[in-house]
Structure formats: C-alpha cells, structure tokens
C-alpha cells in the first residue's frame, strides 16, 4: 500500500482537510531540513505518513539528502521509525539510527553486509557506491562504525567511481570538511585506526546535483580538507586549519600550525 494512499485514509479517519494535510506535509520538509525532531513528530501526528514520497523518493531520503548535520539526525530517523516507517534494509536502518546493538545482531546473521554497496543522494561528499562505513562517516555515527570494523569492515575501503572516473574516496574523506565539523568524532576514530591519509583520488564532485556542485580534482584527505576554504562550502577557516594540522601530523609527523589564520590580507 503506497504512502500517499495511507495518508488519504488518515485524512479521512481524522477528518483533516486536504489543505491541512498539505500544510503539514510542507512543514515536514522544513522540519527535516532543520533536524527538528519534535516538528517531525508533530507532522506525523497530524496525518503525514513517514512512507509518503517527496520528489519521487521516500521521505526518509529527503532526510539523508539534506545539508544539515547534527547529533539529532539519528533522532529524526527514530521519529520515522516510531510512526511505522516501512524500510526493508534493516542493516542500513540500524546505521542511520546508530543502533549498535541492532547492527551487531544483523551482521552476525549477514556478515557480508559490511561490503554491500549503497548509493544515496548527498549534499556534500558523494555517497555513490559506498559501503556502510562511508555512511557512518557522513553522519558521524561512531558506535555503528565500531561495530562494522569489529565485523571486518576496512577503514580504507573505497567508494565506487562514476562515469568520469571521479570517486573512489575512503570514508575519512567524508569527515575532513564536514558542515560545522560535525563528523569530527568519526575523523578521530579513523585516525585512531591509522587510516591511510595519502590516498589520492582522481576527483570528487562535491554537492552533485545541488546549486553548490563543484568538481574538486586530484585530492587526498589532507588537500580535500583544505577545500573547506572554498566560499561555497561555508566552513570555518580556523577549524579547517586545525584539521589540516592534525592530518599533517598524523600522516607525516609534521607539527605545524598556520600562523596566518584568519588570513590578514583578506581582512584588509
């Protein structure tokens, strides 16, 4: 039974008007963008189904494709689940929830899932033919990452490449210039596992399909971190500088802190 049909039944049962439903539907899209857990729950309580579609995709993928990054992401996913989300891939759902206990149980039954490929629309570093560890990196889900590694996931596993040959990034790429540095816990986790910081990819199409889409050619995790200084990324210059210093020390043993951050020339 489709999500739209379910919503129409709910509208009839609760005597919502179509306008009321659409108002809540559009409100839900805004609440997803803001990672407003209570706002999402309110919309589901007023006739919107978590199994509805938006832009020809299930609503849950609007959540995974938005640009906001926060610790509330997993709670937003939980709101979908609590209102009877129909999601077939329970292993992926466990990762999105950062439910380590559930993930561990599923992987005991299906250990090969650590190498399964996924493609999700993503506002930043592409999630094209990635595995679950890339997804953990994107959303800063350390507990799930620890379970995946325990079950044999490789911290240097590579994503797929597109028709141009771009891609092939390892999970740490998703952490080095993340929105508001929200993947710093995963960054530190990968460093604790001695992830390879010298892997160079042909290029990455950052923000593919969004207004900020940008080709970033020939990068490794350290140079990719520097791309956070691009104006379309809206990252903090001091934060990026600290990340680069951390990566340089981990990769090359160089203990260096940039002395001209923020850049004096640009402040004149």
Positions of the model-derived regions?
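Ankyrin-repeat boundary/"N-cap" motif
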Residues: 21-30, 52-67, 86-97, 116-135, ...
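Ankyrin-repeat intra-repeat helix-capping/turn positions
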Residues: 35, 72, 98, 140, ...
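Ankyrin repeat domain, specifically the short helix-to-loop turn at the C-terminus of the second helix
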Residues: 41-49, 75-86, 107-119, 146-155, ...
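Surface-exposed loop/turn motifs in large extracellular/passenger domains
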Residues: 140-142, 179-185, 236-242
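Terminal, low-structured helical/coil segments at or just beyond the last alpha-helical repeat
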Residues: 234-268
């Amino acid at each position: 039974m489709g999500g739209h049909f379910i919503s129409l039944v709910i509208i009839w049962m609760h005597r919502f008007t179509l306008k009321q439903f659409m108002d809540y539907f559009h409100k839900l899209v805004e609440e997803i963008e803001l990672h407003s857990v209570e706002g999402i729950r309110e919309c589901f309580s007023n006739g919107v189904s978590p199994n509805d579609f938006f832009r020809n995709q299930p609503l849950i993928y609007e959540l995974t494709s938005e640009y906001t990054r926060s610790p509330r992401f997993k709670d937003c996913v939980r709101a979908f689940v609590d209102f009877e989300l129909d999601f077939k891939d329970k292993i992926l759902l466990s990762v999105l929830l950062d439910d380590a206990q559930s993930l561990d149980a599923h992987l005991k039954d299906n250990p090969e899932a650590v190498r399964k490929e996924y493609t999700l629309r993503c506002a930043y570093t592409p999630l094209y033919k990635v595995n679950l560890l890339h997804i953990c990196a994107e959303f800063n889900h350390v507990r799930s990452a620890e379970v995946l590694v325990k079950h044999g996931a490789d911290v240097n596993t590579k994503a797929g490449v597109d028709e141009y040959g771009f891609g092939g990034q390892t999970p740490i790429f998703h952490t080095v210039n993340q929105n508001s540095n929200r993947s710093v816990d995963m960054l530190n986790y990968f460093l604790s596992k001695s992830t390879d910081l010298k892997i160079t990819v042909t290029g990455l199409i950052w923000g593919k399909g969004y207004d900020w889409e940008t080709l970033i050619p020939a990068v490794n995790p350290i140079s990719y971190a520097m791309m956070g200084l691009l104006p379309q990324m809206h990252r903090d210059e001091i934060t990026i500088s600290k990340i680069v210093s951390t990566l340089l020390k981990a990769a090359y043993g160089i203990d260096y802190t940039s002395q001209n951050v923020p850049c004096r020339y640009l402040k004149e």
